[in-house]
Amino acid sequence: EERENVLLLSSMHKEDRNMIISQLIGYLKQNVSIQIIWASHEPNNQENKYLSNIFKRNELSVSIVDSLSKVESVNSRVIIINTVGILADLYWKVKLAYVGGGFSSGVHNLMEPAIAGVPTIFGPNYKKFKEAVEILNEGAGKTIKEGSGFKETLINYFNDGKNLVKSSRSAVKIINSHIGATKKIINHIAIY
């Protein structure tokens, strides 16, 4: 099924939020067809309220939801997730993801969005993560060094469908190569 123009901001740390929020709001104001889903690394009422106020002050409608079914039933421009355990499902509903942690402790799981064929954007703290390097090398995602690169990267993906499709295919290719390698290992083990 055709996915909507939705950006998932997943495993968000405060450092990610602080780095990209103004760029994100600027982009959303200029591109009214884009919706976002925001999933904090550790969802809590204080952070949800803080985020909600920022978006509402910028005249963006906000819903805070605690289940996958509610994500599908609201029409707000901004959906804030107030639960854990549904990220893997959310990736199948979006065209692009920003994966948090890259401005603090290290970027989070990049294979989950790749499995869903979703290109990723992440911060500069990724070098100790082999899959992040692979995603960049294969063109399945981009890294930003600071917030100013975020809006430009969103424009590059959402406003040029070819880039999005190409990166999405690269993400799927990475997963397929991992599956192929796993099969070879299992077959090799089975011989012994």
Which residues are covered by each model-predicted region?
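Nucleotide-activated sugar donor-binding and catalytic core shared by glycosyltransferases
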Residues: 1-192
